[in-house]
Swiss-Prot record:
<dbReference type="InterPro" id="IPR016024">
    <property type="entry name" value="ARM-type_fold"/>
</dbReference>
<keyword id="KW-0539">Nucleus</keyword>
<feature type="region of interest" description="Disordered">
    <location>
        <begin position="1"/>
        <end position="21"/>
    </location>
</feature>
<comment type="similarity">
    <text>Belongs to the SAAL1 family.</text>
</comment>
<dbReference type="GO" id="GO:0005634">
    <property type="term" value="C:nucleus"/>
</dbReference>
<dbReference type="InterPro" id="IPR052464">
    <property type="entry name" value="Synovial_Prolif_Regulator"/>
</dbReference>
<comment type="function">
    <text>Plays a role in promoting cell proliferation in response to pro-inflammatory stimuli.</text>
</comment>
<protein>
    <recommendedName>
        <fullName>Protein saal1</fullName>
    </recommendedName>
</protein>
Length: 462
C-alpha cells in the first residue's frame, strides 16, 4: 500500500447518538473494536511464534486498512485526546513490542507521531518511560518507513517546549542514539529518511550545544593505531562529520532542501572550536569536506549565468556553506595549505556579492511596501553578505604575488571582481585589502594603480 487511505466519510455508517468523538463524525465504538482487533491480532501472532503457517510480517489487509484510518484520524485533536484517554500509548507500546510486521510498527509509530502534534497527548507519550525506551530502540530498526516515522515523532516532540528537555536528556543518556543516527546517514539511500534525520539533528544541535559537543567530541579523540576489537569494528568509522558529509552527498542531486539542512548542521558545528576541530581533524584532514563544499560552491551555487535574484533562493545554503568554508580556511591557512586551491572561490564570492548588490537595487530597504517577510529576507541577505565578505577578506589576505599571477591567468582575479571586492570590503576589512593590493602591485602594477585610482578615498588606509 503506497499511501494511507482517507478516513471513512459520514456516509459510511451511521453512529449511534453519543457515540461520536467530540464534534467529529468518528465513532468511539469503531475505535474500540479496531484497537481490540489489533491487540488480538498481535497476541495471536505471538502465540503462533515458531509455526510456519504464515510468513512473518504478514498483516491482514482489512486490518491494515482500518489501522491506516486510525493513523489518518489521529491528526484530529479530538481524536488524539480520545486515544490518549483510551490509553492508546500503552496499547501501541504493547503492539510495537510484540509486532513482527514492519508495516504495523510503522503505522503504530505514525499514530503516536500524529498524537504528539498536540500538547496533552505529547506529554503523555513523552513521560511514558517504557514507551520512550522502545522508541529509542526503533532507531536501530532496518525498515526505512519505521525509521522515518520514528524520526518524525522525535522531531514533533522536540517542537513542544514542555517535553523537549525530556527527549534531549534521553538522547544524551543513550549512546546508541548517536550511533544509529550516524549509521542511517552513512548507509541509507532513502531521501525522505535522510532529510528527516537531518532535521532532527539540526533541531537537537540548535537546542542543546552540550549535546552537540558530546556527540562530536569523539571525532576529535586521538586515533588508535592498534587493531580494534570485534565490537569496535562497526563503531570506528561512524564519525559524525563523515556521516553528515555522506548524507549531504546523497542529497545533493535529490533534495536541495535536504542538502541545505545538512549544510546548516555543519555550520552549527563551526560555532564551537570543538566542532571545527572535528571537521578539520578527520583522518583526511578535512579534505573530503573541503573538496565537496568547494565543488558545491563553484559548480552548483550562484553560477555566472544565473539571474541575480538566485541569491534569494540560495541565501540559506550559501550562508551555511560559506560559513563552514571560512572557518576551515583559517585553519587550513595556519596549517600551510596552498591558497591556490581556493582561487576559484574569489570568482564565486564576487558573484555572490554582485548579485546581492543587484538585489538591493531592485528591492531597496526604503520600499514602503516592505513587510515582515521582506525584512526577514533582508536580514538573511545581510547575513550572507557578512559571511561572504569575511571569507573573501581571509582569502585575499593570504594571496602572494605568485598566487595573484595564477589567479589572473585563470580568470579568477579580474578588474571587475577586484572592484566588487573593494566596494564591499572597505572600510571594514582595510587591512586585508591593503595586503591584497600590495600583492597585486607586485604582480600587475597597472591593475593595482587602477584599483587605487577608482577607490581613492576607501583605499587611502591601504
Amino acid at each position: 500500500m503506497d499511501r494511507n487511505p482517507s478516513p471513512p466519510s459520514s456516509d459510511d455508517e451511521s453512529a449511534p447518538e453519543g457515540d461520536c468523538i467530540g464534534d467529529t463524525i468518528y465513532s468511539k465504538h469503531w475505535f474500540f473494536s479496531t484497537l481490540t482487533r489489533l491487540i488480538e491480532a498481535v497476541s495471536e501472532d505471538k502465540s503462533q511464534e515458531g509455526q510456519e503457517d504464515e510468513a512473518p510480517g504478514d498483516l491482514d489487509e482489512e486490518l491494515e486498512d482500518e489501522i491506516c484510518k486510525v493513523w489518518d484520524m489521529s491528526m484530529n485533536e479530538e481524536v488524539a485526546l480520545f486515544l490518549q484517554g483510551f490509553n492508546a500509548p500503552e496499547i501501541l507500546l504493547g503492539v510495537i513490542a510484540k509486532s513482527k510486521c514492519s508495516r504495523l510498527t510503522e503505522m503504530c509509530v505514525g499514530i503516536l507521531g500524529n498524537m504528539s502534534c498536540f500538547l496533552e497527548p505529547c506529554m503523555a507519550i513523552s513521560t511514558h518511560q517504557s514507551l520512550g525506551e522502545v522508541l529509542l530502540l526503533l532507531l536501530s530498526d532496518a525498515d526505512p518507513p519505521t525509521l522515518l516515522e520514528t524520526s518524525r515523532l522525535f522531531l514533533t516532540c522536540l517542537s513542544q517546549a514542555d517535553v523537549a528537555g525530556t527527549w534531549v536528556e534521553r538522547f544524551r543518556k543513550d549512546p546508541s542514539v548517536r550511533e544509529n543516527l550516524c549509521f542511517i546517514m552513512s548507509s541509507s539511500t532513502n531521501v525522505d529518511l535522510l532529510v528527516k534525520v537531518g532535521e532532527l539533528l539540526d533541531r537537537l544541535f540548535d537546542m542543546d550545544e552540550d549535546l552537540m559537543l558530546a556527540w562530536i567530541r569523539s571525532d576529535c579523540a586521538p586515533r588508535e593505531t592498534s587493531a580494534v576489537t570485534e565490537n569496535e569494528d562497526r563503531a570506528a568509522p561512524l564519525e559524525m562529520v563523515s556521516c553528515l558529509l555522506e548524507a549531504a552527498k546523497q542529497l545533493r542531486s535529490e533534495s536541495p532542501e535536504g542538502l541545505e539542512i545538512y549544510m546548516h548542521v555543519l555550520q552549527l558545528l563551526t560555532t564551537a572550536d570543538t566542532g571545527i576541530q572535528a571537521i578539520v581533524q578527520s583522518p583526511d584532514g578535512g579534505e573530503q569536506t573541503w573538496d565537496f563544499l568547494l565543488d558545491l560552491t563553484c559548480n552548483d551555487l550562484c553560477q555566472p549565468n544565473d539571474p541575480p535574484l538566485i541569491v534569494q533562493e540560495q541565501k540559506g545554503i550559501l550562508s551555511s556553506v560559506l560559513a563552514v568554508m571560512s572557518a576551515m580556511f583559517v585553519w587550513r591557512a595556519e596549517q600551510g595549505h596552498k591558497v591556490e586551491k581556493s582561487l576559484p572561490l574569489i570568482s564565486s564570492l564576487a558573484q555572490v556579492l554582485e548579485n546581492l548588490e543587484e538585489c538591493r537595487k531592485k528591492c531597496p530597504e526604503s520600499d514602503a511596501r516592505e513587510g515582515p517577510d521582506a525584512r526577514h529576507d533582508n536580514s538573511h541577505l545581510q547575513i550572507l553578505k557578512d559571511v561572504s565578505c569575511e571569507f573573501l577578506s581571509n582569502i585575499l589576505s593570504e594571496l602572494s604575488k605568485d598566487s595573484v599571477l595564477q589567479g589572473i591567468s585563470l580568470g579568477h582575479i579580474t578588474e571587475r571582481r577586484c572592484q566588487c571586492a573593494l566596494r564591499n570590503l572597505l572600510p571594514l576589512y582595510s587591512t586585508s585589502v591593503g595586503t591584497f593590493l600590495a600583492a597585486v602591485g607586485e604582480a600587475d602594477r597597472s591593475l593595482a594603480d587602477t584599483l587605487r585610482r577608482e577607490t581613492p578615498v576607501r583605499a587611502e588606509q591601504t
